[in-house]
Amino acid sequence: MMNTTCYRLVVCEKPSVARSIAAVLGAGRREDGFLSGGGYLVSWCFGHLAELSDADAYDEKFGKWRREDLPILPDSWQYTVARDKQKQMNTLRTLMHREDVCEVINACDAGREGELIFRTAYNLNNCRKRVKRLWISSMEDAAILQGFDNLRDGAEYDNLYASALCRSKADWLVGINATRLFSVMYHRTLNVGRVVSPTLALLVQREAEINAFQPESFYTVHLDFNGFSAAGERMKEQAEAERLAGDCNCKTAAVTSVVQTEKTEKAPALYDLTTLQRDANRLLGYTAQQTLDYLQSLYEKKLCTYPRTDSRYLTDDMEGGVNALALCCAGICGTEPPAAVCSGQVCSSKKVSDHHAVVPTMAAGETDLETLPAGEREILRLVSRQVLMAVSAPFVYLETEARLDCGGNAFAAKGKTILHMGWRAYTEKGKQDSTLPELSEGQSLPVSSCAVKEGKTTPPKHFTEDTLLSAMETAGKEDMPEDAERKGLGTPATRAAVIEKLVATGFAERRKAKKSVRLVPTEAGVSLITVLPEQLQSPLLTAEWEHRLKEIECGELGADEFLAGICDMVAALVRDAAPVDGAEVLFPSGRPVVGKCPRCGAEVTESKNGYFCERRSCKFGLWRDNRFLAAKKISLTKKMASSLLTQGRAYASGIYSEKTGKTYDAFIVLEDDGARSSYKLDFTK
């Protein structure tokens, strides 16, 4: 009798997620590389099981980096499976081709990268079975069950996969070609990336602005009254400010106007990943990568919703649960929920793309927070506090602006009276009044004291991870269409990795300041941006690429058209790139210096085959063993090369005579006509 059992194969992104899903599905039997039970086989990847192969997989000659081999533009793409992941790839292949597996469910992360991870494994294993997609924003049991009750057709995500594949290929094309090109041009490994390089350019530009800044002094006259003070306009000259202060001292000032305005500050929206990373850096000192790691762990523990989101709202159908969510968050924070929960202001399906905002799950409210690692606990509380603020009423205050006249000179004073704390009840900032006394137009006030205060203009601030993430998010925004769905450098899911790569490759470093940790470019980072052409460091161009990837995802742009544009750009880059003058100063070789070049004055350094000018546009060199030296059976030593460059000649002993077969001593003299160098012998002492 034939076996009619039909299994559904569930492929997850990592083992921990597979275990959670398997537990919900009743697949509790452990097998080699998968779990089974309840009609399901639940297996996993280890992130990317296979990635685009390196260039030498296409041709052995690409094993050496040569400019003449560029650009490298594969006609068909090859993949390499990491050795430590081959066994799991084989397991997936076996499972996908089992006759009793009738359907494959993609349960990798519900996003661009998760789609790529699954499709790569599916395609490389030549699987042709029907695919369903699990798309969930929470790892709670109820959310998983609901997701399996509402599986989507895998074909609905073909455009998402196309976008992910284009991103991967674009990164390869730019990274492989540009890294090889500039490494060969400047004789050292220079890692160039589609997103990494323009992000580094932001750091370098800011550093240049800070270094070029010249502080300027300014002076302000302050009048003190009973209970408040007023300030005049800024003045450039101290003497002028001192004269004004002298005129006002011990006089009276007249109130010329009093204007009161009621102002409202709306509650902030919920967190998306980038906004959470920014606040976690500013308030807790966490790096973007640390925040993502903590949030990912909370997600896998079913305590937070999906982390890699770019939305700050919930969907409309979630509005009914906002009151319970607020109560849960209040418990996590050890406080009270708002008196009136404004659930409508956090729900808007129109503003949610793939995933809603990051919020705690209801399970988080039932968890003993002390059992969590400190980092996860602080992030969970930060997310919970944001929910409480987001569902609160506005912050309302009365702003009073008084204008005064003293001796014909204008002064101003401002005060603020809080009318309703609203969402600011959950934050320390803005809780204090700064009120002015009751003032009326025409009122005369005695000046109790008068002082001149000096200030200085301040330079732009160094980037922190908070402000760099903001700059990455908004890069190119002003030059792109208002309706563009994705702007900026990278995505919420990739920005942390970009920052970490800059630090890991030595192009940027974290530098502690009094109240923050700055991100600054290293000398190597500044040098790299100095020699890179505009198209590789332009945030606008990279933001435009991100926008086009989003168009591919939405089915508005073809993948072939996008990649053709990338290939054209890479080919033009290889064709047109030329070394920057003075690059030898930016990228010193580190080789021993033997003297100065007689042609251009740059340093001559020792290398394997001789002694050559560091300036690459200059062709001067002294070979260790040219025809002349080989015939004399001598080799040019470092000491001899130094003597040739400083004195024009070098003493040599044991010179072989082809005529007599004997040896003799003489001076070797350097002759250089600006185009070629040669040697001759000199027997004078």
Which residue ranges define each predicted feature?
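Intrinsically disordered, low-complexity regulatory segments
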Residues: 1-165, 172, 459
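Basic, low-complexity terminal or inter-domain segments flanking catalytic cores
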Residues: 5-9, 31, 96, 124, ...
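Amphipathic alpha-helical transducer elements in NTP-driven molecular machines
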Residues: 15-22, 39-42, 46, 82-93, ...
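Feature marking long nucleic-acid-engaging regions of large polymerase/nuclease enzymes
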Residues: 101-104, 120-133, 190, 194, ...
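Metal- or metallocofactor-binding catalytic centers and their adjacent structured scaffolds
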Residues: 155, 238-271, 277
